[in-house]
């Protein structure tokens, strides 16, 4: 996936020259509070089936960038961990090795870049499950996207099990920002997402209102259907 369609990782490349002071991994507690099963996915981290009320914890090394956590819905996997999901599928694998297929609500992060973490919720790949992304030990902001987006999704963005971002459907620079920094701005369709989830990225260059920082060494909690 083009990095301009997701998280602004050019910032992380710039900071990568600095010494990484934090040496312990960050813990991410992933909790399913939905009334239905969610197949949690993490890159890096793999994947896990979470029935309602279940949780899963992963550790992510300092210095990790371009990382994300998301939920998959309506999945079927065989005993070897091969199968498919209606939303968020990652190459038909229970244990994800890459990113998921849109639409999927994303918790994105880069750790210790430098001495602070960059975090966001992104709808640049669309929306499938309500989400909260928060620190477990304080010190920074709780991010939430809990509006009934699937039910209110514009007709041209509706898809089975979720709501597509306009870039996924229309594929022009106006929505995808493929011509580089400053090449696009908010649109009526991106505003649909922003009005309902003001904390979240609604289009690829939505950085000023959507990218947040936490102190390095923070641990996190991602909740589906908070």
Swiss-Prot record:
Disulfide bond sites: 34-225, 75-85, 90-96, 140-214, 145-197, 153-163, 167-176, 177-184
UniProt-annotated location(s): Vacuole
Major subcellular location class: other
Miscellaneous section: PR proteins are acid-soluble, protease-resistant proteins which accumulate in the intercellular spaces of many plants as a result of the hypersensitive reaction to a pathogen. PR-R exists as two isoforms in tobacco, a major and a minor form.
Name listed for the protein in its UniProt record: Pathogenesis-related protein R major form
PROSITE patterns, A to Z: THAUMATIN_1 (PS00316), THAUMATIN_2 (PS51367)
Similarity field: Belongs to the thaumatin family.
Record carries keyword Membrane: no
GO biological process, one term: defense response
SMART domains attached to this UniProt entry: THN (SM00205)
Pfam families per the UniProt record, alphabetical: Thaumatin
GO CC, any one term: vacuole
Organism lineage: Eukaryota, Viridiplantae, Streptophyta, Embryophyta, Tracheophyta
Signal peptide, first to last residue: 1-25
InterPro entries: Osmotin/thaumatin-like_sf, Thaumatin, Thaumatin_CS
Keywords: Disulfide bond, Pathogenesis-related protein, Plant defense, Signal, Vacuole
């Amino acid at each position: 996936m083009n990095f301009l369609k997701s998280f602004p990782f050019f910032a992380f490349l710039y900071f990568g020259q600095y010494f990484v002071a934090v040496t312990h991994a960050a813990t991410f507690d992933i909790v399913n509070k939905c009334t239905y099963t969610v197949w949690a996915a993490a890159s890096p981290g793999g994947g896990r089936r979470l029935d309602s009320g279940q949780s899963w914890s992963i550790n992510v090394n300092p210095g990790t960038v371009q990382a994300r956590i998301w939920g998959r819905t309506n999945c079927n996997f065989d005993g070897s961990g091969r199968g498919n999901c209606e939303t968020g599928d990652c190459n038909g694998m229970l244990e994800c090795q890459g990113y998921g297929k849109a639409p999927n609500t994303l918790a994105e992060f880069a750790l210790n870049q430098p001495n602070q973490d960059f975090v966001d919720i992104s709808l640049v790949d669309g929306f499938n499950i309500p989400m909260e992304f928060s620190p477990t030990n304080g010190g920074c902001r709780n991010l939430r996207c809990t509006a009934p987006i699937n039910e209110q999704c514009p007709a041209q963005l509706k898809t089975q099990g979720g709501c597509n971002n306009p870039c996924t459907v229309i594929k022009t620079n106006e929505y995808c920002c493929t011509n580089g920094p400053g090449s696009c701005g908010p649109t009526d369709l991106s505003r649909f997402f922003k009005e309902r989830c003001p904390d979240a990225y609604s289009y690829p260059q939505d950085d000023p209102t959507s990218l947040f920082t936490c102190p390095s060494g923070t641990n996190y909690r991602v909740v589906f259907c908070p």
